[in-house]
């Protein structure tokens, strides 16, 4: 049985602790009394994944077996999560490939000829042919690409259809092919409690008209947290949209969960608690840190982006989305949930090299903000690990670097908007429509590999709850000019950051270090 998560209190015997800082990492000594949140040990993966998939398809939750839903002459659309999941990317064969292959085998046996596959990329950049092939596998790729395996296009006026509005007046507009299908099979990887469930189709196949109802400042400030659906206004909106979807299209969802094997064997020390490092782990740390530090940034980036994780699959559940998702969340909680007693004055997070929007790309400063104040700050249930008015300290070098193809509108947002204001509400009011409707950004989204024009604004809104909650934000090791552009302060060391934080929280602050990844979901009591 795997050990549960726990909270360590730093004392004289505690070794230096591993902290991520983008495409680098360090060992850091924390002040005595600092609380350190560790996730549960990695759960064992399912040994026979193919059998687990087949069992899920044939014995689903509150739905007929998939074989009973397939018939000749029907329109079947298989939808799958894009490259924003999982993080880091998983080793091949991808579990999505395994599921899709079995669904296609059952469809062929049932005489289903009209089959299309869609990547649920929402307002994300399109997946490249190579990325699609890596996700679905060579056999599926060769059989369906390019005419029947493609990316969702959230800006195709002919390819979208409005299904109705929710009781709150939210427009539900999704991909036409999916909406007009007899059955959607959605293939999901749930990395955190934020993923899956009602979100999958409503967001993955949605348009800007739909997404603006939940990807806005007010909703995100009242999503406390993204990983606590009960208290997330964003998830409440997803659920309302799912009700409308359920009136128009039948959805058979297949959700999978992963264990905590976030890093491969050559960096296995990153999966372990520091006092349990072997001599080999210590040697690996020293060697990798030396090589990593000596390498140019572009080389480090390429190496880390090709670091594929040997995840084990901890669950495969299929059927009606509302019936499946509770089982999925239970598996996520088994792997990630750690009880924490109360809040601290200061929260500390080390940010890794990866986020949902820099896969095979570059972590630009706006994505650093989104990763830290959005994704990592929101890795809690009930309450944040840091009190209201407290200080958030994040580790990341925050280089002033952008991918010119993927993040075209990010560059303009950074240069023309953040130089004027960092206020999410003002940005939303004054700039969102311009970025969302700009014809050049729309062209790049549809024909190149750029994120939608509005995407950098949404990533800024992603940190709105943290900006409202925290009294100060400090980045350790960050480029000072870049941090200042974003409205944050920079410190050279943790000691400097703590000294700066005392201006806000006093001379004897309590400190909590959220040690992730592997991901820990803090259940703050």
Predicted segments, located by residue:
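Conserved, well-structured core segments that form the ligand-binding/active-site neighborhood
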Residues: 142-343, 374-378
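Glycine-rich phosphate/diphosphate-binding loops that line cofactor/substrate pockets in enzymes
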Residues: 61-82, 109-112, 338-345, 386-387, ...
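Short internal beta-strands
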Residues: 111-124, 254, 393-396, 472-477
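Histidine-anchored nucleotide/phosphate-binding helix
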Residues: 87-111, 206, 375-385, 393
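Short glycine-rich or small-residue beta-strand-to-loop segments that form or flank ligand, phosphate
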Residues: 75-90, 116-123, 186, 348
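C-terminal catalytic subdomain
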Residues: 360-472
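Well-ordered mid-protein domain cores that form the structural environment of catalytic cofactors
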Residues: 93-171
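Extended hydrophobic packing segments that form well-structured cores
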Residues: 2-40, 45, 57-58, 461-525
